[in-house]
Amino acid sequence: MAISFDKAFGIHQYTLSVRSKRAEVLSSNIANADTPGFKARDINFSQALEEAQQQQGFGLATTSEKHFALQMDAPGVTQYRNPLQPDTGDGNTVDVQQERSEFLRNSLEYQTSLEFMNSKISGLLKALKGEQ
């Protein structure tokens, strides 16, 4: 009997990749907090998750370095964030407190998905070994 990882892991396998990409975007925002003209960005999580599922659903794999890599940088996935604070005069829209808060929240959600995946993998290993 074949094991369907899509059924076993559900949406959590896709959330890990989207949350990882979001961590990169949020880190970039924090790193550029003092860069004049830098515009804070964020990922439209639901749209990125949907696109990640669709990309994975095609079963595309890069078996050669000449293959094109799939990216989550499609239009609409990474968007500019609307600033909550008034313009400081240099055109930078990064609110460091908001970025740190979002980064922490994203990290906790990533950890939650990772723990869920680990428990699913442990369950599958027990099933394969014949344990309860």
Curated annotation (Swiss-Prot):
Coiled coil: none annotated. It comes from the Bacteria. Keywords: Bacterial flagellum. Signal peptide: none annotated. GO terms for cellular component: bacterial-type flagellum basal body, rod. One of its GO terms (biological process) is bacterial-type flagellum-dependent swarming motility. It is found in: Bacterial flagellum basal body. PROSITE patterns: FLAGELLA_BB_ROD. The basal body constitutes a major portion of the flagellar organelle and consists of a number of rings mounted on a central rod. In Gram-negative bacteria, at least four rings, L, P, S and M are present, whereas Gram-positive bacteria lack the L and P rings. The rod consists of about 26 subunits of FlgG in the distal portion, and FlgB, FlgC and FlgF build up the proximal portion of the rod with about 6 subunits each. Structural component of flagellum, the bacterial motility apparatus. Part of the rod structure of flagellar basal body. Belongs to the flagella basal body rod proteins family. This is Flagellar basal body rod protein FlgB. It comes from Aeromonas hydrophila subsp. hydrophila (strain ATCC 7966 / DSM 30187 / BCRC 13018 / CCUG 14551 / JCM 1027 / KCTC 2358 / NCIMB 9240 / NCTC 8049). The gene is flgB.
